[in-house]
């Protein structure tokens, strides 16, 4: 195991900066996930750690050693890519041992490591098979095994589940989580799928246009996003946003006017520092935090546009006339409502978020479970 530290790391191709002043501390044995939309720089960041991309400026440390100029093979890292990249003419055992053979490892060492890793990944009964005889999930396990037999200090995974169908992704997610718990290796995992990030990570790094938007535990990012980008990216369906105007402030409270015909006002339990009366801000509320109207004091009303019945839950898209945008309401179980009907939902102030015009969040003061 080894720690990974990035200090003011920047990557640029000419005038185009793809990673800017990245500062990260990844501790020994941590499972860290880089997540963000396409083009945010997450794979580039992983490749710089691996040594497959040069660092324009800044410093990379693995353990106590500065690695900027160290060749990839000498960094003690192993990498799994989105593509399995298995040799079709070699068996599972031969694919897994290929790197060790090139490195000149002794046969008994190779056999011991391959058998140990095959047992961990439940591949023992498949060692003699060729890749064409394997399922997608089995091929990905072989690709992971090929990296594990080299016993890297840091394990890098670049969107390893993207080529799998939904059911296999869930299965492999569970297997990767178990593998980390069993081996205790430092793992850095890249994905655009925030569900993978939330379920796998000890710590999530959210990237936006080459910058670190926020670093924290999954539930910290979900309940206390640092800005509107993180709030909208973490969570599915994504957070609802409403334009509001500040009408009053008090200690640890901000009063805002909702964009409704009755101009209803509501006090939000958020930090009021630097918030000015009259300022235009955004109120955020997650679909699953909206309430049935009969148990709430603050009511929003609109017309049902779309109803998605998922069996275990219902997602209702409601158009609020005064703001000409849809809100998404999610409720467990089946909710029977017709498209075109008028539907009212409740807005719980303690579950609301408040964002300034520059996108930064006012710190929420409501204590959420698990954080």
Swiss-Prot record:
Keywords: ATP-binding, Cell inner membrane, Cell membrane, Membrane, Nucleotide-binding, Sugar transport, Translocase, Transport. It catalyses: D-maltose(out) + ATP + H2O = D-maltose(in) + ADP + phosphate + H(+). It comes from the Bacteria. InterPro entries: AAA+_ATPase, ABC_transporter-like_ATP-bd, ABC_transporter-like_CS, ABC_transpr_MalK-like, ABC_transpr_MalK/UgpC-like, Mo/tungstate-bd_C_term_dom, NA-bd_OB-fold, P-loop_NTPase. It is found in: Cell inner membrane. The keyword Membrane applies. SUPFAM superfamilies: MOP-like, P-loop containing nucleoside triphosphate hydrolases. Its EC number is 7.5.2.1. GO terms for molecular function: ABC-type maltose transporter activity; ATP binding; ATP hydrolysis activity. GO terms for cellular component: ATP-binding cassette (ABC) transporter complex, substrate-binding subunit-containing; maltose transport complex. It is a peripheral membrane protein. The keyword NAD does not apply. ATP binds at residues 36-43. PROSITE patterns: ABC_TRANSPORTER_1, ABC_TRANSPORTER_2, MALK. Its main location: membrane. Residues 4-234 form the ABC transporter domain. Belongs to the ABC transporter superfamily. Maltooligosaccharide importer (TC 3.A.1.1.1) family. Part of the ABC transporter complex MalEFGK involved in maltose/maltodextrin import. Responsible for energy coupling to the transport system. The complex is composed of two ATP-binding proteins (MalK), two transmembrane proteins (MalG and MalK) and a solute-binding protein (MalE). This is Maltose/maltodextrin import ATP-binding protein MalK. The lineage of its organism: Bacteria, Pseudomonadati, Pseudomonadota, Gammaproteobacteria, Enterobacterales.
């Amino acid at each position: 195991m080894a720690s990974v530290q990035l200090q003011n790391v920047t990557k640029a191709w000419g005038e185009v900066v793809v990673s800017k002043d990245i500062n990260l501390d990844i501790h020994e044995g941590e499972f860290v996930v880089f997540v963000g939309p396409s083009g945010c720089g997450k794979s580039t960041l992983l490749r710089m750690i691996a040594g497959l991309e040069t660092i324009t400026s800044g410093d990379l440390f693995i353990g106590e050693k500065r690695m900027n100029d160290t060749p990839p093979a000498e960094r003690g890292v192993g990498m799994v890519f989105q593509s399995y990249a298995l040799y079709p003419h070699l068996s599972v055992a031969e694919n897994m041992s290929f790197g060790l053979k090139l490195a000149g490892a002794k046969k008994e060492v190779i056999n011991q490591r391959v058998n140990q890793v095959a047992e961990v990944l439940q591949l023992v009964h498949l060692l003699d098979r060729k890749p064409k005889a394997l399922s997608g999930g089995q091929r990905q396990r072989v690709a992971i095994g090929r990296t594990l037999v080299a016993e890297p200090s840091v394990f890098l995974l670049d969107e390893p589940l993207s080529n799998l169908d939904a059911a296999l992704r869930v299965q492999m997610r569970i297997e990767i989580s178990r593998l980390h718990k069993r081996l205790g290796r430092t793992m850095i995992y890249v994905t655009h799928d925030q569900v993978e990030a939330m379920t796998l990570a000890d710590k999530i790094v959210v990237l936006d246009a080459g910058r670190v938007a926020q670093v924290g535990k999954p539930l910290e990012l979900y309940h206390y996003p640092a800005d509107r980008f993180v709030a909208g990216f973490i969570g599915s369906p994504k957070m609802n946003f409403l334009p509001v105007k500040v009408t009053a402030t008090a200690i640890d409270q901000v009063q805002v006017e909702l964009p409704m015909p009755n101009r209803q006002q509501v006090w939000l339990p958020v930090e009021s520092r630097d918030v000015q009366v009259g300022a235009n801000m955004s109120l955020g509320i997650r679909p699953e935090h909206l309430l049935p109207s009969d148990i709430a004091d603050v009511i929003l009303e609109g017309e049902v546009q779309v109803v998605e019945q998922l069996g275990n839950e219902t997602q209702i898209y409601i158009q609020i006339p005064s703001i000409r945008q849809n809100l998404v309401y999610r409720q467990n179980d089946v909710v029977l409502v017709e498209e075109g009907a008028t539907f009212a939902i409740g807005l719980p102030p303690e579950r609301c978020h408040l964002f300034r015009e520059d996108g930064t969040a006012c710190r929420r003061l409501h204590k959420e479970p698990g954080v």
